[in-house]
Amino acid sequence: MITRLIRQWDADIVIVNRPNDYHPDHRYTSILVQDSAYMVTVPFFCPDVPALKKNPVFLYASDRFKKPNPFQPDVAVSIDDVIEPTLDALLVMESQIQEGGANGYAGLFPEEPVGRQRRTEESRRSLARRYAGEATRYRDVLARFYGDERARNVHYAQAYELCEYGRQPSTDELKKLFPF
């Protein structure tokens, strides 16, 4: 199914978590997408949807896991201009971002409106700090694409690592795929 969807979308870029993510759903989805990274170009696999002539670029979203190997960014993108809509979109997913429930603790998301608003604001600040941390942590990668001066002024960023199974773009191609 994933192979079919990528073909139907005629994707240029596919972004997924790395296969050593903390969450089982993330790990297994990553493996399925990795498998599709090869299969999207194989004509006799899922013959009901035409195989892609050009393999998409498959990217891993950044994380802080160190084992079995740490995240190694190949591209970093400023999200300064879209940080607010990015946070708004993430906060809509209450069950994923705000409710908690991990490790058996279900008390993070209060039922009363004032408490819910407070939790939403805490989650917003936490997510913003994460993206600010990426801008700081991957400043050198930002500089490769934006130049030193512009990179110094980036407040929020997202970084990505190339998946070894998809197309391996050059720096010039990455600059075309991501408008710097």
Q: PLM features: residue spans?
A:
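Active-site beta-strand->loop->alpha-helix modules in alpha/beta enzyme cores, enriched
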Residues: M1-C46, L52-K54, Y60, F71
